[in-house]
Amino acid sequence: MESRLGWLTDLSTETGTNLRRTSIICTIGPKTNNPETLVELRKAGMNIVRMNFSHGSYEYHQSVIDNARKSEELYQGRPLAIALDTKGPEIRTGTTTNDVDYPIPPNHEMIFTTDDKYAKACDDKTMYVDYKNITKVIEAGRIIYVDDGVLSFEVLEVIDDNTLKVKSLNAGKICSHKGVNLPGTDVDLPALSEKDKSDLKFGVKNGVHMVFASFIRTAQDVLTIREVLGEQGKDIKIIVKIENQQGVNNFDDILKVTDGVMVARGDLGIEIPAPQVFAVQKKLIAKCNLAGKPVICATQMLESMTYNPRPTRAEVSDVGNAVLDGADCVMLSGETAKGNYPINAVKTMAETALIAEQAIPYIPTYDDLRNLTPKPTSTTETIAAASVSAVFEQKARALIVLSTTGDTPRLVAKYKPNVPIVMVTRNPRAARFSHLYRGVFPFVYDESSDSEWTVDVEKRINFGVKKAKEFGILVDGDTIVTIQGFAAGVGNSNTLRVLTV
């Protein structure tokens, strides 16, 4: 049997003619929100457009959607997915008097209050916090972070229902509208703010393909989002963002009801000790891999490329190790939203991911997934797992999967084949959200169904082979493995074949 260590000793660091299978998500901002730049991002490797609803108006986000769709008219390529990232429930400070920044020294004692009369009258003596229950959930000795941890305070005393006495642990400035984090404290904020609900309805109206749901703490939070999306948004994938200790603690229950996961390391690294973040990342990714649910690694992956043309070596290692951990997708934030080198950042991420994919010991990974997956599995999963085994044994160059809902490609992707998964579907939405699954190359087959099922199957397989040749996946003489159904309808994927192109 192939060993992990043996695999690494023979590792090639050349990209060669291999095709990257890890998807890349790009946050779109002022530097990239035009059709021409979006085309260049797609050519560089972008698969999913991310809109950050913590910033921008509906008019602006509408322009991102319109420009993304315009880019597909200018350059066909692979289908492009669009993701809506919610602002989520959060805690913020109030407005300082005259919007002035107030410097404070270390060991400075002051008051945090939920009294609304201070909402626009904060200073270096009293700071308003918009979380009414803060005095009920926190206790003396706890730490409060302000402005992503730039300022740290220790709670000295809970004075009454509205008031905390705190002491600064470092020097800094009191500013308006800064985020507040309560590490180690269970908060009871609602899953969705009114703004979030309005944003989700905007997403449904505009046909987004997935929602990145911020600050998810419980499984019920996911169900609440699904309820707001309603019947019209039933096909929108919900990707939970794990950003706090509660989300980590409740992860197993959350994983059962979500469509996928984002390990959002920014806020997570404030809510839990920073040295623990890498271990939590590995643990959550492993659980997602075993469950067959897509997982995204995000935040500060190539942060220095916001302003520099080359990444730090640590950043490149971070991207590569996220791929090795098992991430289906990696994400860029400020690098493509406001950065000076957005195209170069995507190219760097794409090349790094491609090399990292060659470092994965595929057969031992497959064996782990097969051995740890509870039995019996569904018929579709059994066929999916068998197809990946067939790829290894036949040294096939690709899998071609006929799918209606995208579920079979998801299950094939779970078992980490070392070749592309060519997905042929008549469902454009399924084609787009399938970018969440590592290795899936989706293509939309828009011909009408043939009355003879077997004829229709062969036409779609031939279409998949044709597209795979166009994209450099296959050449004549290659061996392929195909998955199809024995009859029309959802859930009938039960036939595996080995063919020669």
UniProtKB/Swiss-Prot annotation:
<feature type="binding site">
    <location>
        <position position="86"/>
    </location>
    <ligand>
        <name>K(+)</name>
    </ligand>
</feature>
<dbReference type="InterPro" id="IPR015813">
    <property type="entry name" value="Pyrv/PenolPyrv_kinase-like_dom"/>
</dbReference>
<keyword id="KW-0630">Potassium</keyword>
<keyword id="KW-0808">Transferase</keyword>
<keyword id="KW-0460">Magnesium</keyword>
<comment type="subunit">
    <text>Homotetramer.</text>
</comment>
<dbReference type="GO" id="GO:0030955">
    <property type="term" value="F:potassium ion binding"/>
</dbReference>
<dbReference type="GO" id="GO:0005524">
    <property type="term" value="F:ATP binding"/>
</dbReference>
<protein>
    <recommendedName>
        <fullName>Pyruvate kinase</fullName>
        <ecNumber>2.7.1.40</ecNumber>
    </recommendedName>
</protein>
<dbReference type="InterPro" id="IPR036918">
    <property type="entry name" value="Pyrv_Knase_C_sf"/>
</dbReference>
<feature type="binding site">
    <location>
        <position position="54"/>
    </location>
    <ligand>
        <name>K(+)</name>
    </ligand>
</feature>
<keyword id="KW-0324">Glycolysis</keyword>
<feature type="binding site">
    <location>
        <position position="266"/>
    </location>
    <ligand>
        <name>substrate</name>
    </ligand>
</feature>
<feature type="binding site">
    <location>
        <position position="50"/>
    </location>
    <ligand>
        <name>substrate</name>
    </ligand>
</feature>
<feature type="binding site">
    <location>
        <position position="299"/>
    </location>
    <ligand>
        <name>substrate</name>
    </ligand>
</feature>
<keyword id="KW-0067">ATP-binding</keyword>
<comment type="similarity">
    <text>Belongs to the pyruvate kinase family.</text>
</comment>
<feature type="binding site">
    <location>
        <position position="267"/>
    </location>
    <ligand>
        <name>substrate</name>
    </ligand>
</feature>
<keyword id="KW-0418">Kinase</keyword>
<dbReference type="InterPro" id="IPR015795">
    <property type="entry name" value="Pyrv_Knase_C"/>
</dbReference>
<dbReference type="InterPro" id="IPR015793">
    <property type="entry name" value="Pyrv_Knase_brl"/>
</dbReference>
<keyword id="KW-0670">Pyruvate</keyword>
<feature type="binding site">
    <location>
        <position position="92"/>
    </location>
    <ligand>
        <name>ATP</name>
    </ligand>
</feature>
<comment type="pathway">
    <text>Carbohydrate degradation; glycolysis; pyruvate from D-glyceraldehyde 3-phosphate: step 5/5.</text>
</comment>
<dbReference type="Pfam" id="PF02887">
    <property type="entry name" value="PK_C"/>
</dbReference>
<feature type="site" description="Transition state stabilizer">
    <location>
        <position position="241"/>
    </location>
</feature>
<feature type="binding site">
    <location>
        <begin position="52"/>
        <end position="55"/>
    </location>
    <ligand>
        <name>ATP</name>
    </ligand>
</feature>
<feature type="binding site">
    <location>
        <position position="52"/>
    </location>
    <ligand>
        <name>K(+)</name>
    </ligand>
</feature>
<dbReference type="GO" id="GO:0016301">
    <property type="term" value="F:kinase activity"/>
</dbReference>
<feature type="binding site">
    <location>
        <position position="178"/>
    </location>
    <ligand>
        <name>ATP</name>
    </ligand>
</feature>
<dbReference type="Pfam" id="PF00224">
    <property type="entry name" value="PK"/>
</dbReference>
<feature type="binding site">
    <location>
        <position position="85"/>
    </location>
    <ligand>
        <name>K(+)</name>
    </ligand>
</feature>
<keyword id="KW-0547">Nucleotide-binding</keyword>
<feature type="binding site">
    <location>
        <position position="267"/>
    </location>
    <ligand>
        <name>Mg(2+)</name>
    </ligand>
</feature>
<dbReference type="InterPro" id="IPR001697">
    <property type="entry name" value="Pyr_Knase"/>
</dbReference>
<keyword id="KW-0479">Metal-binding</keyword>
<dbReference type="GO" id="GO:0004743">
    <property type="term" value="F:pyruvate kinase activity"/>
</dbReference>
<feature type="binding site">
    <location>
        <position position="243"/>
    </location>
    <ligand>
        <name>Mg(2+)</name>
    </ligand>
</feature>
<dbReference type="GO" id="GO:0000287">
    <property type="term" value="F:magnesium ion binding"/>
</dbReference>
<dbReference type="InterPro" id="IPR040442">
    <property type="entry name" value="Pyrv_kinase-like_dom_sf"/>
</dbReference>
<dbReference type="InterPro" id="IPR011037">
    <property type="entry name" value="Pyrv_Knase-like_insert_dom_sf"/>
</dbReference>
<dbReference type="InterPro" id="IPR015806">
    <property type="entry name" value="Pyrv_Knase_insert_dom_sf"/>
</dbReference>
